[in-house]
Amino acid sequence: MARLLVAVVNELSYRALVWLTYRLAATVALGLPFVLLIWSAWRREPVVQRLLGLYWKVASLMGISLLLLTDERPLGYVTAVVAPVLMVVSVWFWVDLNEELADQPPWRPLPLTVRLWRWALSGFGVISLVMTATGLRCMQSQSSPDCSAWLEAPQGIHRGVETVFDFVFGGQWTEAVAAFVGYVALVAYLAGLLQWLLVRLPRYGRVAGEF
């Protein structure tokens, strides 16, 4: 009885941590940068717009992970681990953008908020990396309750998208369709990443320029 109780508590605790990771992602990795993007467009801050434009290109891997996990595709667990690492790197990597941000007056609200957000994103990246790494064991077997916790949010989002898709287009947005779109998007993502690694990085290094 005691062992069963401990197992139930551990299961609930792990599920709570998984949902905390998803909520942090929705806040720090999606919500805040979206607000900052609108803010920077309104204030016409080109350096912040360029930084966030690059960030959103990289962060699309998180959306790809959700599409793959919707249909319980094992590859989704791998991309979920890689995504936060690349997202954190994308906001610190560029030398010219770092210098331009450093030159901004520290008392200005938008540059200050961007600086704070970058550190918050870095903290989220560490938490997300640790948590998603524990989900890699689900690549072999997804029948455990711990693995089900990782699927709840993607499948919940899928049900909402499915309802909207059916209402607007009168078609079916199934789990298989979501996974197919995820695979196509992943191929495009990897092609863009490979092109950057082989062509742009050797030529321009850590300078974002007009990229």
Which stretches of residues belong to each language-model region?
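Short juxtamembrane and helix-loop transition motifs at transmembrane-helix boundaries
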Residues: 10-19, 38-48
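Hydrophobic transmembrane alpha-helical segments in integral membrane proteins
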Residues: 4-32, 175-183
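Membrane-interfacial loop-to-transmembrane alpha-helix junctions, especially the N-terminal start
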Residues: 47-56, 209
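Membrane-interface helix caps and helix-loop-helix hairpins in membrane proteins
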Residues: 46, 68-77
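C-terminal membrane-adjacent module
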Residues: 120-211
